[in-house]
UniProtKB/Swiss-Prot annotation:
Binding residues for Na(+): G163, C166, T169
Assigned keywords, A-Z: Allosteric enzyme, Cytoplasm, Hydrolase, Metal-binding, Protease, Sodium, Stress response, Threonine protease
Activity regulation info: Allosterically activated by HslU binding.
Primary site of residence: cytoplasm
Organism per entry: Pseudomonas paraeruginosa (strain DSM 24068 / PA7) (Pseudomonas aeruginosa (strain PA7))
Domain of life: Bacteria
Positions of disulphide bridges: none
Gene Ontology CC: HslUV protease complex; proteasome core complex
A molecular function GO annotation: threonine-type endopeptidase activity
Keyword Protein transport: no
Protein name: ATP-dependent protease subunit HslV
EC number(s) per entry: 3.4.25.2
Family annotation (Pfam families): Proteasome
Gene Ontology biological process terms from the UniProt entry: proteolysis involved in protein catabolic process
Length: 182
């Protein structure tokens, strides 16, 4: 699946917190259509953070399906993610959706792709979308060389750096935070 992830989503785990943030830019081709979209939200009674990169309408469908899986599996993040990925691969209507999800709860952070992949990234760090490489490099540098920064500060700084480099990412951020077991 070829996704045009014209956004940046970052999730960071540090010092008992998990943070997920995203920029607010929606682009259509080379035109900015909206600058204050909310691409990160809370699901399952506020216990799960979810963000998307890719087609907005497709992402809302995936949020809905993922939340149904969370309800079905009593909030078990990994099980819900695996079941969504299986559905995404096998259901013809879902297989056409062009988006990726980043999801996190107090225990785990995962990336779910339309190829059926469920990946738990290293370092408790997710960075995806068009500015994901910039954000990941910035976040890793901050995590490795500045122990005083909070998870929120790392995520915000990484997103702002990505927004200053990537033309499909702005600096109008949505940030959500949970206490983490890890």
């Amino acid at each position: 699946m070829e996704i045009s992830p014209l956004t940046t989503i970052v999730s960071v785990r540090r010092n008992g917190k998990v943070v997920m943030g995203g920029d607010g830019q929606v682009s259509l081709g080379n035109t900015v259509m909206k600058g204050n979209a909310k691409k990160v939200r809370r699901l399952y009674h506020g216990q799960v953070l979810a963000g998307f990169a890719g087609a907005t309408a497709d992402a809302f469908t995936l949020f809905e399906r993922f939340e149904q899986q969370l309800e079905k599996h009593q909030g078990h993040l990994v099980r819900a993610a695996v079941e969504l990925a299986k559905d995404w691969r096998t259901d013809r209507s879902l297989s056409r959706l062009e988006a990726m999800l980043a999801v996190a709860n107090k225990d785990a952070s995962l990336i779910i792709t339309g190829n059926g992949d469920v990946v738990e990234p290293e370092h408790g760090l997710i960075a995806m979308g068009s500015g994901g490489g910039f954000a990941q490099a910035a976040a890793l540098a901050l995590l490795q060389h500045n122990a005083e920064l909070s998870a929120r500060e790392v995520a915000e700084t990484a997103l702002n750096i990505a927004g200053s480099i990537c033309v499909f990412t702005n600096q109008n951020l949505t940030i959500e935070e949970l206490d983490s077991a890890v």
